[in-house]
Regions:
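Histidine-acidic metal/acid-base catalytic patches
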Residues: 1-11, 17-28, 99-101, 158-180, ...
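Acidic-residue sensor for enzyme active/binding pockets
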Residues: 36, 148, 154, 189, ...
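Short histidine/acidic/glycine/proline-rich micro-motifs that form metal-
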Residues: 11-14, 39-43, 70-71, 151-154, ...
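Structural motif corresponding to the early beta-alpha repeats
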Residues: 33, 37-128, 236, 240-248
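Active-site acidic/histidine proton-transfer and metal-coordination neighborhood
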Residues: 78-177, 259-262
């Protein structure tokens, strides 16, 4: 495997501040090439010291973001949709300051918001319109949108590869592309490798997560099959490891499936390189 390997900083919780700079140093020492940096603070000035530190450590970076109930992009309320769009535009501004050419995540709709029904044609239209305008802003900043689908328990707009492809087709913008997260795919897809092959050259980012959100190789996800599929489509971009702990309340993690963060960091990269 020749892809660069990254680590998602959400393992340490949602407080993404300079106290994590020592963690960045440990991640670099463990052999990682980059990190996923969650953009929750949408003040661009917040990310200037982050760019400096990542440049100092020669760590690549991918910006990721998530929207909560207050920024629901497919709300029936036009003011809410506008608010969500403006918030995501600010996330793009922060990604640019950070030095990332990609904004990844499920920001097509709000996490954990449901209506009791599948998405309507009107909601699908709102999503595509919102994302097209966001992609236009991303184009001005030389950033690509990497859209992620979530599983059925976290999102009702898109929860599988086919639905995500349909949404991105509807957006129809070169700066709006696809990403893959093995945690959600493990729940929703019949075959993980086939899902990746279906994404093909539109796949711009990959997150590898174990079925229990713990150390890679300690669960039942077939990562060898995933890596084979990535080779089949000539995927050469970063592969990020995503694991969560009880520090991330939104993920509903009630027990940690690892000894400590650095055990997970070290064992996961060693496992991935051994496949």
């Amino acid at each position: 495997m020749t892809n660069k390997i990254g680590m998602n900083l959400l393992l340490w919780g949602t407080e993404i501040n300079t106290s994590l700079f020592s963690v960045l140093e440990q991640i670099k020492a463990a052999g990682y090439d980059g990190v996923e940096v969650p953009i929750f603070d949408t003040n661009p000035d917040h990310w200037k010291p982050w760019r400096e530190k990542l440049d100092e450590l020669e760590l690549d970076r991918v910006a990721v973001t998530i929207n909560g109930p207050d920024h629901h992009q497919i709300s029936a309320d036009p003011s809410m949709r506008h608010k969500a769009l403006e918030r995501n535009k600010m996330a793009l501004e922060c990604a640019q300051v950070l030095g990332s050419s990609l904004l990844a995540g499920p920001y097509h709709s709000a996490l954990g918001v449901f209506t009791g029904s599948k998405s309507s044609e009107e909601e699908n239209k709102w999503a595509a319109e919102n994302l097209f305008e966001l992609a236009e802003h991303a184009k001005d900043l030389n950033i690509t949108l990497g859209l992620e689908y979530l599983n059925r328990f976290e999102s009702y707009l898109v929860s599988c590869t086919d639905e995500l492809i349909a949404l991105v087709d509807r957006v129809n913008h070169p700066n709006c592309q696809l990403m893959f997260d093995s945690f959600h795919a493990n729940i929703e897809e019949t075959n993980l490798g086939d899902a990746i092959r279906k994404m093909g050259n539109r796949l711009v980012h990959v997150q590898l997560s174990e079925n229990h959100r713990g150390t890679l190789g300690a669960g039942h996800v077939d990562f060898k099959d995933i890596l084979t599929a990535l080779e089949d489509i000539n995927y050469h971009s970063m592969i990020s490891i995503e694991a969560f702990s009880s520090k991330l309340s939104a993920a509903n993690i009630w027990r940690n499936m690892f000894d400590d963060e650095m055990q997970l960091v070290n064992d996961s990269i060693q496992y991935l390189k051994s496949i």
